[in-house]
From Swiss-Prot:
It comes from Arabidopsis thaliana (Mouse-ear cress). GO terms for cellular component: membrane. This is Mannose-P-dolichol utilization defect 1 protein homolog 1. It is found in: Membrane. Residues 27-93, 150-205 form the PQ-loop domain. The chain crosses the membrane at residues 25-45, 62-82, 91-111, 123-143, 174-194, 202-222. The lineage of its organism: Eukaryota, Viridiplantae, Streptophyta, Embryophyta, Tracheophyta. Signal peptide: none annotated.
Amino acid sequence: MDYLGIDLSCAIGSLRNGEFPAKDCLLPLISKLLGYFLVAASMTVKLPQIMKIVDNKSVKGLSVVAFELEVIGYTISLAYCLNKDLPFSAFGELAFLLIQALILVACIYYFSQPLSVTTWVKAILYFAIAPTVFAGKIDPFLFEALYASKHLIFLSARIPQIWKNFRNKSTGQLSFLTCLMNFGGALARVFTSIQEKAPLSMLLGIVLSIFTNGIIMSQILLYRSKGNEDKLVKSKKIS
């Protein structure tokens, strides 16, 4: 019995016989189900960040470069997976993350007006080149090189935000919930990637994501806790 690429016959057969499914049967099943869960969960990952920006009408403390690089990274990753005909459960979340990342950058641009000429040029170039990349109409060697560079791109996307947080001693409008979901999703992807026998480079990228998102989460907790303490001290002085 195969449903959405998930082979259920092994597990169902064991349960019918009153037996608990064996490890070799259960782990791949869990991996597939977890993969589809991550795809479903990815539909809301960046919504807390988008809502926080819209509600506060502010992008204070956010690194524009960081979010722009995320869009590039998701674009390359999704295009590569589509052209390699990988199963949707293995990369489906990339489609939803890219859509949300584009909305997020649009929100940042909207609340950062007036926009510079450079910003307009970057936006035009992206929408001019992206369709070609998605169609796979580029040199195969260049495509492989772009995909190999995605880990560096995502790492570069986190570093400006981490540095800005450290420099300002504040995380501004960063959403803790979005960072937490990114962190948890990366942890789950370690398991699914090992089960799907993903290449070492992919695992390395996931580990880097866990590390950088962990740093940003700790910064949010540290600086917001410090900010609350400062407010408490000021209120006591006033009273």
